[in-house]
Amino acid sequence: KSYIKKKYNKPGSVFLGVIHRLDRPTSGVVIFARTSKALTRINQQFKDRETQKKYWAIVDESFDSNSGTLTHWLKRNSNINKSYAHRLEIIDSKKGILHYKKIKNLNRYCVLEITLETGRHHQIRSQLSFVGYPIKGDLKYNAKRSNPDHSIDLHARSLTIFHPTTKVIMTIIAKPPIKPQWNFALSD
């Protein structure tokens, strides 16, 4: 808030609203609103599914297909902060849909680009684990081992929204963390 107050020469208190979140061990794009009106308008875009979120994930094993769609029913267990994917709808489950495209094959891993159609709790982590491809370092969702820094190799690569006042399409892109696994995964 102090940065915004100084940069925009704001008198009095400064508004800063969190529009969306990332799982704690995930890296990438997070956006904030500087006004309550912008917060309301962008939240409505998320509610109406007018936003587009792309993620990069390094997954255990070499993913079988080059692209596809995963559709599951996700049920959240708040007691252990985990969501479970199911093939069929069950009580209190929500439909989760994601699209994936293989970016690169590595020796024991591959890099996927994931586009979310729905935004459910731990959706990417749960669905990829359910089909046998947990995210590297994600012990909660069956990865073989943790990363040394306890992060997981899931990165919120980009977020596309409409500017809350001008309605211009904006795409915010975040570079992956400077870590050996990402450097190796994305090198040519």
Where are each of the predicted segments found?
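RNA pseudouridine synthases
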Residues: 1-188
